[in-house]
Amino acid sequence: MWKSRRAQLCLFSVLLAFLPSASSLNGDSKYMVLVPSQLYTETPEKICLHLYHLNETVTVTASLVSQTGRRNLFDELVVDKDLFQCVSFIIPTLNSPDEEEFLYVDIKGPTHEFSKRNAVLVKNKESVVFVQTDKPVYKPGQSVKFRVVSMDKTLRPLNELLPLAYIEDPKKNRIMQWRDIKTENGLKQMSFSLAAEPIQGPYKIVVHKQSGVKEEHSFTVMEFVLPRFNVDLKVPNAISVNDEVLQVTVCGKYTYGKPVPGQVKISICHETEAGCKEVNSKLDNNGCSTQEVNITELQSKKRNYEVQLFHVNATVTEEGTGLEFNGYGTTKIERITNKLIFLKADSHFRHGIPFFVKVRLVDIKGDPIPNERVFIKAQVLGYTSATTTDQHGLAKFSIDTAGFSGSSLHIKVNHKGKDSCYFFYCMEERYASAEHVAYAVYSLSKSYIYLVKETSSILPCNQIHTVQAHFILKGDLGVLKELVFYYLVMAQGSIIQTGNHTHQVEPGEAPVKGNFDLEIPVEFSMAPMAKMLIYTILPDGEVIADSVNFEIEKCLRNKVDLSFSSSQSLPASQTRLQVTASPQSLCGLRAVDQSVLLLKPEDELSPSWIYNLPGMQHNKFIPSSSLSEDREDCILYSSWVAEKHTDWVPHGREKDVYRYVEDMDLKAFTNLKIKLPKICFDSAPMSGPRGKFDLAFSSEVSGTLQKGSSKRPQPEEPPREDPPPKDPLAETIRKYFPETWVWDIVTVNSTGVAEVEMTVPDTITEWKAGALCLSNDTGLGLSSVVPLQAFQPFFVEVSLPYSVVRGEAFMLKATVMNYLPTSMRMSVQLEASPDFTAVPVGDDHDSYCLSANGRHTSSWLVTPKSLGNVNFSVSVEAQQSSEPCGSEVATVPETGRKDTVVKVLIVEPEGIKQEHTFNSLFCASDAEISEKMSLVLPPTVVKDSARAHFSVMGDILSSAIKNTQNLLHMPYGCGEQNMVLFAPNIYVLKYLDKTQQLTQKIKTKALGFLRAGYQRELNYKHKDGSYSAFGDQNGEREGNTWLTAFVLKSFAQARAFIFIDESHITHAFTWLSQQQKDNGCFRSSGSLFHNDIKHPVVSKALSCLESSWKTIEQGRNANFVYTKALMAYAFALAGNQDKRNEILKSLDEEAIKEDNSIHWERPQKPRKSEHNLYKPQASSVEVEMNAYVVLARLTAQPAPSPEDLTLSRSTIMWLTKQQNSNGGFSSTQDTVVALDALSKYGAVTFSRRQKTSLVTIQSTGSFSQKFQVENSNCLLLQQVPLPDIPGDYTISVSGEGCVYAQTTLRYNMHLEKQQSAFALRVQTVPLTCNNPKGHNSFQISLEISYTGSRPASNMVIADVKMLSGFIPLKPTVKKLERLEHISRTEVSNNNVLLYLDQVTNQTLAFSFIIQQDISVRNLQPAIVKVYDYYETDEVAYAEYSSPCSSDKQNV
């Protein structure tokens, strides 16, 4: 196809070459037509016509010619003798984003004919789109909020339909997608929730425009703790190689602006030298420290580098907490310690006119150096000079170019003289020098015009800028009476302004010279850069010109102001945010905690940022073909000499008018002299840039015009550059700490004002607020960033452990900080509670003085008395008192005189947690049915730890629906386990939809869980499209066949509900296909840590299944129960009813029928503990195979028979008894398959209740509770605590319909030695308290081996609970993942979880470190639990204590 297109282009180019392109001129008529080199569709564009000395009426025609034909732009009849006028036209939309086309300009009259073409780029009008997020960095599990903004190039809002937007994770997985997003008044707000364990790193929001152009915005996902304070490090940008001291200033400031007390460590390192210099100091009262660091030993004088660096690091450690934050900086070591900067030196010079140079001499800090000699040399001219810098470091020179005929001027300026140190060998100080090259402006007559750019500053909008023009005209001017200068101003690739100036020529004046001023209005449309071209035409047809660029203020028409009612507010107080903008503007507001921006700085929304957006950039058009303009013949050298009477020949580097026009991004159609003449010798063109044209023509003729060319132009370098008063004694209880406070859209009223009342969050910080507003009249406006300090004169911080064990005691500490400049008398109080006892430590609780900018800590020795969550409320209040504080009178602040902090502590019982669940499915039909239940406790139960509750549900899936993200009391840390967070939501949605019970609330919740599970599962994807339990782990693991098939199936089902990138399904399917053998079976690949489902019949290939069934049928081995169940379901899915029936019949012979239920058990079960009071829950594989039997019966074709439903119900009765308290089962895969079976059974048998069901539970004592179940509350989980444990209860059900009853019993039991499937040994290092380190930090060492009935366990979880007040040292835990047998580690609030692939009889040993966070007294032992993930009855317990747990010293 490409070759065909190239051939068409080639033929088209050849045909175009035969179209009229020569000029036929009459008399002195002159033509100059200027048009932008890039034209935009659906936008008014201008072509400027300049015709004069016409002696007849002519018609000017402009048209575009492309492969699709010719489009006429305009026909203009010109009757005037002289004309300078711009004509507007509009080009219709293209079918492609852009096209290179030929623009033809034809001028025809009775005796005139002029035709010329040039290549231009026609582009469809493009919108400007960008994305703003509510913050730059997110934690796992947080919601990413963002808004899409759409505008045209004038920055006015668009109601644009954007076809596609998506979020891409660091592995380029598309994790969320939206289609057909419609912006309203230029704005669309959207959000997306991150998974609890997403891939961490840089994410992208990608938005596609209708043209196919993509706009991207990045954000970061990472685990972080917001910095409490900022470290500001100041070092010089550069120092001399001879400097011996480096001044370093470090300041620590809290986010609310107050100084940080503490220490600072400064480290200075040379980038190429070993070793560093360190200095320690204390921060002063302002939170700062300035140090003069001797760096002599770090300096080097012999290095092969022009510039080297010092890397400076400052670590500030907060007093009291030990928190550390860093600041970084670099300082250059330069041997050129002074610099010469050209302030004025044009890029081009004019022969015969002085060339002015102005330079500034500055030192290494950028400060001007006065009274120093500066030398200048222009070697080609033989010009040398010297002068002394003035008080501003300036030196000025004027270079005479009279008699100079060269094409370039090389200028060098020096400070002092020659260097004693050359090249890069040494690091001694060198003297400053600078060079500049200027090229000649071409004019055969030596006539010139020159525009003076008086200032290098940025031009402000809405003002008049005066441009001064100087000119000198030589040569034969004849009887010229007046001279007209024409000018154009361009911005963003379009002609913005035009005008002219007439100069009267005095008779006999020669040469003609003078100057004049042009007043240019600076408009919004000219930003960020405007270009001005001025030219005039001499009588002989020569054109002289000049141009100048202006940097324009990046201004916005819509003036937006944002303000808070006060710049400082108390936490939890009311404030008002006011926005002023153009009337009816739509404004997006944002306010972010400054701590977030300290953690991850971002580019601030500003006019500069807007004008640098890709959609605002004007790209220079470079034609893809050498046929972009008509060929021109060269002039023979002999003719040149005869005509011009000179043997001087242009060199080719001079700047002619053609290049001035080209630099303006204009195309010129003219019969005037605007180009350097091309001189030929012996009919051959001169060598040089333009001499290559003929060769280029022959080699590139096939590429004349390109539609949607891939050779895109490069962007130009951007220019350098009050609420009602509150009771001041109102108490502040701080509990709301968002990272983004304001993220909202408001509409400004007709007077241009919008006000929003809001509550200040409880975070003591500085909030950074901003607004962007869009108006149909004035476009986009941005406010400056407005701070609000959420601050109170004093506040209290409370520290306590995450949890303690009953019987332990800990020190609760409350630190009060005073940030007023005066002293206060304070009282601090811990609110009394029956849940704990608190003994004050010290005598300062009633009243004490707190000095200005001081802090004070009060302590209580606390012993909890109740189990569960215990609240601690600490209040501090400034008191009115006549008693002085030292020599000062104690003051009381007007507002914020009391601060209260409430924190929660978990108090746990000692021992091992146990849970038992008793489930019953009652299906009543008028007659009452009942069941007795006994709750008993073991003799080793921990006192007061037992609790139980009874639940009633009207739907078989009620419990699972309520707990879809917490179905198991187990971790979910691998790819297979994550699917239990994903797949059940599909079954729930399908079931509720089919039974017409799906509410919007449940749907929203389930869709959120599906999206989170989808994100998490992508963590475990391999590059080849497969999946494994722990991902590829840098290529060390291969994909797992079973898990890949499961993910493929689940993703395919989830497509009906959420976005799933189709590539993930395609890649998984392709990988699975590659694993299939010739016989239809699949190669078993990768590790699956559930040994009981590692049978080869995972294949869905029927030929493989047929062969497997024959083997099983012949063997009659009971080991194949699981296999039969799975095969029955597989044949049912494949539609092979005969095979399904045959296998189900075989299974019926092995079924266990008891208690009105039917189920199947596997042989060779692991032995059960003799100490079990209750029948244990069925194993994972047994639940799974029974669920497969139900699924096989329900997948009958065309529908399940009454017998299928009856038998399924009997198995469902057994399955429901295996559910845990959250609606899940034993493990992950059994939960997924069983919930699938329950949902399908429920959907098939669902019917609306005709009568209410009445459920009653009563004890042998006085307790009795009734529940009603009806259609309106079928999904409601009704619950009541049970008072008598131990105790006997009776459950009775009457009415009509099925109800699901569940009793959950929980208690703790003391650890006792018993037979288990694992040998577990735990000890601490050091073992005793002899080592002082044992108080605060020690190592936990574990040894594990498998002693069960199988050769090896399944995947094993080691759950290590932390001692109260201790936390794990995370790096030492993470390091365990390097061990071969540990695939993953997790650190939660109070536990460390270790995932072991499997455990054999070979002992595995590993250890990590824990350290004390808060001191706890009477420290109780902590439990370590090791269990088989899929055989949860295989479990072992051990306990450990602190080496110093028996230490009786005070805490």
UniProtKB/Swiss-Prot annotation:
UniProt keyword terms in alphabetical order: Bait region, Disulfide bond, Glycoprotein, Protease inhibitor, Secreted, Serine protease inhibitor, Signal, Thioester bond
Residue ranges, annotated region (Disordered): 703-728
Chain segments annotated as coiled-coil in the UniProt record: none
Biased composition (Basic and acidic residues): 713-728
Superkingdom per UniProt: Eukaryota
Compartment(s): Secreted
Disulfide bond positions: 48-86, 251-276, 269-288, 461-555, 587-773, 634-680, 849-885, 923-1274, 1081-1104, 1298-1444
GO molecular function, one term: serine-type endopeptidase inhibitor activity
GO cellular component, one term: extracellular space
Sites carrying sugar chains: 55, 294, 313, 500, 749, 776, 871, 1401
Keyword Signal assigned: yes
Tissue-specificity statement: Plasma.
Sites of the Isoglutamyl cysteine thioester (Cys-Gln) crosslink: 974-977
UniProt-annotated stretches for the region Bait region: 677-734
Oligomeric and partner information: Monomer.
Assigned protein family: Belongs to the protease inhibitor I39 (alpha-2-macroglobulin) family.
PANTHER family: MACROGLOBULIN / COMPLEMENT (PTHR11412), MURINOGLOBULIN-1-RELATED (PTHR11412:SF133)
Name of this chain's protein: Murinoglobulin-2
Organism: Mus musculus
